């Protein structure tokens, strides 16, 4: 059967619908295309274009995590697209729609493709194919701080051809804003979960708009209607219908719940299921094809729903007796391949020569529409805007530099030229460098924030990777320069480093270059790491050897030959070496009385030898070069410039690594876990297809509470107003989002909240559900005739629009967790499990019940997440249920099933309020009441819908607005909601003002009277609750502990990396100081190894920040639902992390301790005590990381301040600067430092009564010592330190504190626990 002719102004008549669409007047907010004299659309395209696509035996597979294993995604597809035609893809999520589009867009990465895929008779030209294709992806990934207009303009600047004038670009942006009804939002930021921006539906239109900028011949749109109401979807598809008719553009569109009028706009239909094609052919022949197989479309049934459901539930449409002749994707696909329809399509593929008259040929064009210099400029401008918009992060970086500069400046204020301050200069230089290094950890979050957008734009060839890479570098320079200058000025001049302009400039340059270099290092790690959590683990582990082998903690002569290569490749070594040479070279040092050997301030110093020291002593270091010599550094002044060049070269190397990984690595999470697949297959064997009529809510125990309390919940609200604070013209004002809303819901009632995008539906739902965290609410809300109490969460549940779910749980575990924590504690576990199993079956989740939910693209699809989200809330068996867009992201079959379930829950006596965007006729019939809002949050209608929407439509008919009998009533009411409409009433012209007419209506008067009288009948029993939580504390502890433990063990990569990092660094540190003897040199090495071991615990702890941040969103949702107590949540989270903290500490400590030769007694007591202190220190640092993750809003800021805290802790612990050298004004900080006490304990544990000796090179000879005989002799050799107690005295550590300080360590654990609890209870970083 030949496809219909293309190029006509109208598409063929559909057998199941009405006359097809032709160019129409403007409807609602979106604009119809305007034409110039030549018939071309004004402001968008200037020439006709199109693309002829043919696919023969197209198949695709992708590798799994199991080596050598492949998973089929597409199987043997045959289809075509012609210029001017529109093809609709239907199929349940996971059917392969996205894979088809990626293949057509030539955006494949790890997939293996076979078969033939031709574009205008040729294979895809990899260089220019993207210039002819516009691909609207499923997800809405944008730079959150950019406004809608800026987002479109950026796309226009880079996707419109070189030479296009600014006027043309702006005209196209204006056109798209008007077309997508975003003109009013053009100056609103796009936003994300942390930054309030446009609504979900508006964000989807932004996603579409950035691709509409292109002069594309082929439009690919993957579920563009998600989050849009039905009217907006229809208008959008009409626009593309016009575009196809006039400009011969070929379109392939995947939709989930298309209405009849939307479906009629398409020429061809493609139905997919599980990667198989079960139909491709003319839309007009689709129904007759399936009727030929024995499946009939019921009367008044949406054909799109019929097409989507027929493979999964063939028994619903089979006319004959017995079992349907076909079941499953493969059987339907084989039937199609054996049909005359398929043969007709194959003949067209084989015999039809592509008519390229209307086809745009871009093969002669350059790969990118704009030159590289222009790409770099635009990408850099965007990066600078991103930087400026992140005001909190920028301020934190500057404040951090000022604070640290002042701390160091006052701590090391006015350094002298004695021995102690000579060492302090070295410590200051090393610490300053570490501060610069660790400040770069915030770059991990910066890159991950932009990475998904970069992937999309890289695939779309907006710019070369090099342009994006340079934008990251350029945008970092100003802020790095500013924070470096502030820090260096304070540190250098307050500390009294050499007052020399050249040396100061060098100090500034080295720190600045080092800052940029390590920013690039952290971004390089982020470019290849699969997620931010692993990046936060890998980066410190890779950095630790560089720090250890920098020459400060382990001088060059102490490093064994097997590790000396790390010393030579450590960038920190060269930076430290350059700064040390810059400061120490040329300085002359002296000794205070206490610093000479022997000290001049000893009582017998002036007595002749051997009764005293004969008034003679030696000052060991008198020149700065001797400090350099001790560390094995060059003693000439010019080599520091070589060091600077080497650090710059390392920065360039890290930058190249970042560029390489950005260019060549594209993290793709679609490769499934074989264990998940295996579990899912087992589950699918047990699954049974059930009709909705078989879902007995009472058997499912969804009316358990009703047996105890015969009613649901009465809720009423009056004069409800909601306002938010905004700034306009520099003044604080209040913007009203809801304006005097009235309404109610009662048991058995299913109330729909509807209105166009931006009308305030979700806002109203949040206010009613008590989920708003900001703004100002006025008016009255009563629950069962009383004000809302703290027990409100016991009787209510809220299905949020955004599906925030625990990523490591399986589907069944997530729903079961909700049931066990929210159902009554006296309900047996067996009944709870049965209850959950019925929910899983009803929501068609049985096949994936054992699959992990995952995060982002990793794990479940959008549709599956939505159903799991609904299941989690249904598991609480609520009396009052709020749902925000429960069908968004679902196909029509799944959406109808969900709404049937919700309707039955309402029928069982529950009260339900539900926002909904684009309900089909079948779905809209489920609602018995409607609250209709217009933009601005004003009521247009509140009342019953009536049988077949008779009451609702009757209200509008009374005002002269008649709904076409074949039109979906839901679409009709949205069409007439917003504007004043000119109509006729009783034969006279009439203006319909939606809000005013409702206020004056009898409906409104009756509603107000009912609310004033009270919705709840007098004498109705009210449920009483005796606790905030449904479950006992014991149940909460068990369930939270189980979930938290499984979350830990399922992060396999994280655990593996975490433990390998500990083992690696333990072996490295142990072999660096292998079998230390009790010599003078090894005194300092022992102190270094003990200090580094503790600080490694700090670095290890900070890597948990992304995990805590990821869990935080789930916690916010569950806490708002009243699932569990905060202390129990926190306690179980910490307890389940303890084994991994213990393993990390032990795996590090064992090789480090025994290989290095730290102190051992026959009973092993020093080792066990050291291990215990290491474990407690690691645990405290892990708790400190949780404090930062819960208190601070983003990963970037938490990492930045966590690095600062770690730096300050290491500074005041007593290693960098001995306690005696700490200024009195800062001594309290030394005493507050949580690292001070474990360091003191492990030092006492190691050095107490330990004997030391000197090698021949370490002993000191004192010349010209006066003896009792009156002669002068050389006395020596003298060993400066012979007992470890001398070291303890130098660091002001007392042996009796070895066990006393344990109480302080545990005190910090309690303190951090309290801080985390307070943060979880009172701080929310997600605003509503």
Swiss-Prot record:
Disruption phenotype: Cells that have a abcG2-abcG18 disruption have an endocytosis rate roughly 70% that of wild-type (or rtoA disrupted cells). Disruption on abcG2-abcG18-rtoA cells have an endocytosis rate roughly 20% that of wild-type. The exocytosis rates of abcG2-abcG18 and abcG2-abcG18-rtoA disrupted cells are roughly that of wild-type; abcG2-abcG18 endosomes have an unusually high pH, whereas abcG2-abcG18-rtoA endosomes have an almost normal pH.
Subcellular localization: Endosome membrane
Taxonomic superkingdom: Eukaryota
GO process terms (BP): aggregation involved in sorocarp development; cell differentiation; endocytosis; endosomal lumen acidification; sorocarp morphogenesis
Record's bilayer topology term: Multi-pass membrane protein
Any one Gene Ontology cellular component term annotated for this protein: membrane
CDD domains: ABCG_PDR_domain2 (cd03232)
ABC transporter domain mapped to chain residues: 53-299, 721-960
Transmembrane parts of this sequence: 398-418, 428-448, 477-497, 504-524, 534-554, 559-579, 642-662, 1059-1076, 1087-1107, 1128-1148, 1172-1192, 1197-1217, 1303-1323
Principal location listed in the UniProt entry: membrane
Classification via InterPro entries: AAA+_ATPase, ABC2_TM, ABC_transporter-like_ATP-bd, ABC_transporter-like_CS, ABCG_dom, ABCG_PDR_2, P-loop_NTPase
Disulfide bonds: none
GO molecular function list: ABC-type transporter activity; ATP binding; ATP hydrolysis activity; ATPase-coupled transmembrane transporter activity
Alphabetical UniProt keywords: ATP-binding, Endocytosis, Endosome, Membrane, Nucleotide-binding, Repeat, Transmembrane, Transmembrane helix, Transport
Function: Required for endocytosis and endosomal pH regulation.
Name this polypeptide is given: ABC transporter G family member 2
Organism whose genome encodes this protein: Dictyostelium discoideum
């Amino acid at each position: 059967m030949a496809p219909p002719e293309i190029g006509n102004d109208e598409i063929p008549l559909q057998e199941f619908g009405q006359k097809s669409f032709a160019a129409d007047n403007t409807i609602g907010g979106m604009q119809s295309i305007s034409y110039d004299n030549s018939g071309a659309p004004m402001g968008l395209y200037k020439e006709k274009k199109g693309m002829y696509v043919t696919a023969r035996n197209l198949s695709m597979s992708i590798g799994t995590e199991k080596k050598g294993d492949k998973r089929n995604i597409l199987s043997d597809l045959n289809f075509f697209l012609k210029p001017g035609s529109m093809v609709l893809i239907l199929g349940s999520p996971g059917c392969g729609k996205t894979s088809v589009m990626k293949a057509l867009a030539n955006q494949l990465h790890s997939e293996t493709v076979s078969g033939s895929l031709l574009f205008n008779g040729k294979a895809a030209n990899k260089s220019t194919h993207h210039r002819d294709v516009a691909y609207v992806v499923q997800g809405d990934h944008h730079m959150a701080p950019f406004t809608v207009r800026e987002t479109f303009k950026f796309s226009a600047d880079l996707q419109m051809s070189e030479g296009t004038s600014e006027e043309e670009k702006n005209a196209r942006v204006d056109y798209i804003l008007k077309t997508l009804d975003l003109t009013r939002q053009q100056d609103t930021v796009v936003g994300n979960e942390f930054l309030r921006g446009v609504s979900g539906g508006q964000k989807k239109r932004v996603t579409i708009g950035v691709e509409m900028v292109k002069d594309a011949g082929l439009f690919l749109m993957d579920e563009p209607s998600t989050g849009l109401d039905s009217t907006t979807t229809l208008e959008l598809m009409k626009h593309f219908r016009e575009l196809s008719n006039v400009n011969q553009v070929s379109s392939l569109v995947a939709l989930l719940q298309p209405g009849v009028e939307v479906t009629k706009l398409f020429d061809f239909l493609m139905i997919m299921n599980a990667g198989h094609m079960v139909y491709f052919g003319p839309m007009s022949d689709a129904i007759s094809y399936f009727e030929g197989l024995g499946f009939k479309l019921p009367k008044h049934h949406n054909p799109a729903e019929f097409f989507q459901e027929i493979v999964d539930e063939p028994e619903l449409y089979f006319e004959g007796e017995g079992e349907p002749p076909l079941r499953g994707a493969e059987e339907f696909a084989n039937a199609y391949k054996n049909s005359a329809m398929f043969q007709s399509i194959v003949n067209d593929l084989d015999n039809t020569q592509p008519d390229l008259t209307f086809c745009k040929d871009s093969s002669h064009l350059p790969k990118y529409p704009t030159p590289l210099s222009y790409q770099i400029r635009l990408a850099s401008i965007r990066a600078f805007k991103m930087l400026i918009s992140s005001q909190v992060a920028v301020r934190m970086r500057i404040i951090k530099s000022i604070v640290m500069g002042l701390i160091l400046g006052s701590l090391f204020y006015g350094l002298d030229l004695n021995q102690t301050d000579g060492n302090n200069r070295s410590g200051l230089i090393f610490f300053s460098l570490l501060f610069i290094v660790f400040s770069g950890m915030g770059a991990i979050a910066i890159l991950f924030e932009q990475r998904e957008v970069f992937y999309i734009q890289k695939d779309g060839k907006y710019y070369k990777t090099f342009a994006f890479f340079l934008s990251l570098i350029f945008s970092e320079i100003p802020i790095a320069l500013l924070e470096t200058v502030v820090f260096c000025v304070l540190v250098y001049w307050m500390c009294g480093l050499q007052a020399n302009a050249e040396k100061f400039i060098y100090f500034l340059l080295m720190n600045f270059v080092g800052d940029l270099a390590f920013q690039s290092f952290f971004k390089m790690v982020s470019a290849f790491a699969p997620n931010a959590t692993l990046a936060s683990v890998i980066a410190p582990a890779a950095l630790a050897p560089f720090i250890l082998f920098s020459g400060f903690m382990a001088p060059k002569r102490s490093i064994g030959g097997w590790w000396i290569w790390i010393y030579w490749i450590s960038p920190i070594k060269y930076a430290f070496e350059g700064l040390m040479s810059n400061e120490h070279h040329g300085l002359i040092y002296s000794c205070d009385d206490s610093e000479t050997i022997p000290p001049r301030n000893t009582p017998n110093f002036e007595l002749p030898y051997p009764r005293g020291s004969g008034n003679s002593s030696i000052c060991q270091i008198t020149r700065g070069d001797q400090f350099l010599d001790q560390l094995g550094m060059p003693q000439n002044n010019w080599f520091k410039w070589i060091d600077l060049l080497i650090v710059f070269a390392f920065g360039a190397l890290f930058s190249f690594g970042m560029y390489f990984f950005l260019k060549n690595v594209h993290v793709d999470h679609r490769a499934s876990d074989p264990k998940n697949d295996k579990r899912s297959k087992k589950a699918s064997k047990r699954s049974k297809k059930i009709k909705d009529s078989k879902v007995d809510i009472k058997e499912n125990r969804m009316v358990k509470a009703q047996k105890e309390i015969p009613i649901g919940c009465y809720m009423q609200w009056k004069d409800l107003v909601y306002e938010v604070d905004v700034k306009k013209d520099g003044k604080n004002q209040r913007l009203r989002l809801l304006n005097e809303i009235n309404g109610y819901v009662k048991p058995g009632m299913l109330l729909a909240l509807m209105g166009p995008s931006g009308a305030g539906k979700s806002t109203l739902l949040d206010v009613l559900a008590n989920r708003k965290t900001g703004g100002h609410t006025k008016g009255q809300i009563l629950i069962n005739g009383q004000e809302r109490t703290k027990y409100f969460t016991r009787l209510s549940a809220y299905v949020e629009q955004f599906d925030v779910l625990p990523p490591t749980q399986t589907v069944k575990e997530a729903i079961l967790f909700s049931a066990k924590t929210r159902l009554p504690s006296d309900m047996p576990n067996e009944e709870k499990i049965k209850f959950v199993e019925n929910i899983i079956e009803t929501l068609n989740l049985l096949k994936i019940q054992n699959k992990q939910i995952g995060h982002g693209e990793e794990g479940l699809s959008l549709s599956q997440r939505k159903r799991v989200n609904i299941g989690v809330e249904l598991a609480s068996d609520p009396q009052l249920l709020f749902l925000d867009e429960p069908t968004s992201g679902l196909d029509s079959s799944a959406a109808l099933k969900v709404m049937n379930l919700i309707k039955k829950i309402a029928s069982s006596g529950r009260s339900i309020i539900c926002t909904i965007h684009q309900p089909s006729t079948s779905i809209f019939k489920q609602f018995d009441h409607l609250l209709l809002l217009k933009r601005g949050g004003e009521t247009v209608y509140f009342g019953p819908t009536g049988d077949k929407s008779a009451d609702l439509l009757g209200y509008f008919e009374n005002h002269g607005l008649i709904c076409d009998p074949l039109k979906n009533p839901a679409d009709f009411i949205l069409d007439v909601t917003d504007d004043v409409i000119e109509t006729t009433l009783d034969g006279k012209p009439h203006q319909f003002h939606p809000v005013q007419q409702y206020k004056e209506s009898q409906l409104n008067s009756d509603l107000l009277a009912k609310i004033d009288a009270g919705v709840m009948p007098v004498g109705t029993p009210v449920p009483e609750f005796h606790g905030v939580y449904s479950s006992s504390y014991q149940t909460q502890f068990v369930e939270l502990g189980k979930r938290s433990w499984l979350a830990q063990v399922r992060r396999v990569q994280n655990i593996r990396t975490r433990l390998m990092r500990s083992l690696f660094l333990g072996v490295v540190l142990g072999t660096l100081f292998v079998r230390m003897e009790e010599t003078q040199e090894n005194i300092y090495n022992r102190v270094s190894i003990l200090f580094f071991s503790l600080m490694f615990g700090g670095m290890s702890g900070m890597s948990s920040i992304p995990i805590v941040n990821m869990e935080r969103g789930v916690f916010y949702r569950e806490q708002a639902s009243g699932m569990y107590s905060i202390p129990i949540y926190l306690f179980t989270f910490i307890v389940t992390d303890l084994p991994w903290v213990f393993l990390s500490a032990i795996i590090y400590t064992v090789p480090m301790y025994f290989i290095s030769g730290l102190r051992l007694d026959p009973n092993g007591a020093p080792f066990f005590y050291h291990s215990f202190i290491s474990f407690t220190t690691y645990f405290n640092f892990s708790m400190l990381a949780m404090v930062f993750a819960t208190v601070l809003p983003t990963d970037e800021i938490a990492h930045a301040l966590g690095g600062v805290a770690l730096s300050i802790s290491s500074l005041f612990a007593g290693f960098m600067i001995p306690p005696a050298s700490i200024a009195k004004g800062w001594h309290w900080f030394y005493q507050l430092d949580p690292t001070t006490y474990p360091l003191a304990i492990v030092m006492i544990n190691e050095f107490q009564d330990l004997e030391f000796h000197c090698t021949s090179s370490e002993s000191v000879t004192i010349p010209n010592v006066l003896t009792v005989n009156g002669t002068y002799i050389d006395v020596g050799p003298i060993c400066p330190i012979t007992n470890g107690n001398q070291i303890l005295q130098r660091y002001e550590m007392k042996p009796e504190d070895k066990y006393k300080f344990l109480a302080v360590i545990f005190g910090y654990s309690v303190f951090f626990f309290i801080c985390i609890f307070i943060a979880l209870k009172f701080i929310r970083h997600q605003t509503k």
